[in-house]
Amino acid sequence: MSAFLEFRGISKVFPGVRALSEVSFGIECGRVHGLLGENGAGKSTLLKILGGDYQPDGGQIAVEGRPVAFPNARAALAAGIAVIHQELQTVPELTVMDNLLLGHLPSRGGFIRQGEAMAWTRAQLARIGVDLDPKARLKHLSIGQRQMVEICKAILRDARVIALDEPTSSLSVRETDILFRLVKDLRAQGRALIYISHRLDEIFALCDGCTIFRDGRKVADFRSMADVTREQLVAQMVGRQIDDIFGYRPRAPGDVRLRVEGLMGPKLAEPASFAVRRGEIVGLFGLVGAGRSELARLVYGADRKTAGTVVLDGEPIRIRAVADAIRQGIVLCPEDRKEEGIIGCRSVSENINISCRRNRRPGWGGFNLFVDDRQEAKTADHYIARLRIKTPHRDQPIRLLSGGNQQKAILARWLAEDGMRVLIIDEPTRGIDVGAKNEIYQVLYELAERGVAVLMISSELPEILGVADRVLVMSEGRIAGELPRAQATEHAVLNLALRPRRDPCVAAQAA
């Protein structure tokens, strides 16, 4: 069968970097084709060219054998091509209904027919099996729910080609199951699908074949997933063999560095108490909605606590705002990198140095009022090299970097900060390739070996089991249990994560 969609010698150059170099391959109708590669390999750039966001510097796209050009995203949609980017394209202030029908709202005489729009939205969401309130504003939804809105929008446009870039990175288990069903239904309908994921289990479960990128070039093409093993995929992606992605390095933890006692906030069901020792990596696991990120934000001062105490190195401390936590040496790498972790319009150097107090020079009154540009450049170059951040230069806007390199820059920000005592890192490797994951784990081990207490939040259970010295499990807004590494099996952790909260009335009757 001839390819429905073809990439013919696609090249793209940005200042200082060649993102794509003469990439050619095709996709047939009724197939799911995987795209694999490390962060910065060029996968997302190719999808942005397909979706009309970027224009190629060389080569062409062909649909049914005819060359096409998409000057913008609207032209691509009109041609039946929908791209779901890793960075969501939704409007937070609008409702689910408004986002799904944006640009297509039914109207008469200049007025939107709200009743018809609402009925259509409810019917379509029910048809594809997604449980969302059409009236809910997206800013009040979780990242995973917003991702489902983006996916639904592409499906409801009846696109002939649908490209998905890391679609499950923010989804719950149930939402992932819904997505898998939708992808299989679309394949059965004869649509052509492109699927980018760093989760190799998903690639083997969904894709018929795959193409592998490395450094902007196509390095391998597999017609059938039966022709390749997981180990071969990883070796092709990173250009080297990775035997153990986690590379766990055992340590002997020291005294308790962070102790949380009876911490309570609006989104927790019960007061939370736990401790993290010097040189220890504690994994915090729970299903979506369990309260993991909410607990971290309370410790960090991003949300206001209603009760409880935070004790650091044996001394109770007062954290009323994020600045208080940072001054005490408690730092956070947030779950939502784009919205909370980076300043997209600023350079890599500025994002690394934004909290680095040692790069300030004293001004009037002895206050550190002035930025030492030379020292900032030196700091940025040091951590770009140390963490292997792929960027043409330190002044590159950070929004142009891949998700994995953005995460490394956020880590570099706190590595550059003197006096870090506690690192809270939320979803450290979400949307990140195998090679970059291994590098980030090594950084966490190095920090622990320096005596930093690390609290690692992750929804990926293998990551928790592979990296953590001890595991805390949350369920329904409370800490459901704690397991040492030797006892932390998938069965034991999930048993705690799925354990329902005991009804106080039932507990009283039992007593």
Curated annotation (Swiss-Prot):
ATP binds at G37, E38, N39, G40, A41, G42, K43, S44. GO terms for cellular component: plasma membrane. Gene3D superfamilies: P-loop containing nucleotide triphosphate hydrolases (3.40.50.300). It is found in: Cell inner membrane. The keyword Nucleotidyltransferase does not apply. SMART domains: AAA. Its EC number is 7.5.2.12. Keywords: ATP-binding, Cell inner membrane, Cell membrane, Membrane, Nucleotide-binding, Repeat, Sugar transport, Translocase, Transport. Residues 5-240, 240-501 form the ABC transporter domain. It catalyses: L-arabinose(out) + ATP + H2O = L-arabinose(in) + ADP + phosphate + H(+). One of its GO terms (molecular function) is ABC-type L-arabinose transporter activity. It is a peripheral membrane protein. InterPro entries: AAA+_ATPase, ABC_carbohydrate_import_ATPase, ABC_transporter-like_ATP-bd, ABC_transporter-like_CS, P-loop_NTPase. Part of the ABC transporter complex AraFGH involved in arabinose import. Responsible for energy coupling to the transport system. Belongs to the ABC transporter superfamily. Arabinose importer (TC 3.A.1.2.2) family. The complex is composed of two ATP-binding proteins (AraG), two transmembrane proteins (AraH) and a solute-binding protein (AraF). This is Arabinose import ATP-binding protein AraG. It comes from Ralstonia nicotianae (strain ATCC BAA-1114 / GMI1000) (Ralstonia solanacearum). The lineage of its organism: Bacteria, Pseudomonadati, Pseudomonadota, Betaproteobacteria, Burkholderiales. The gene is araG.
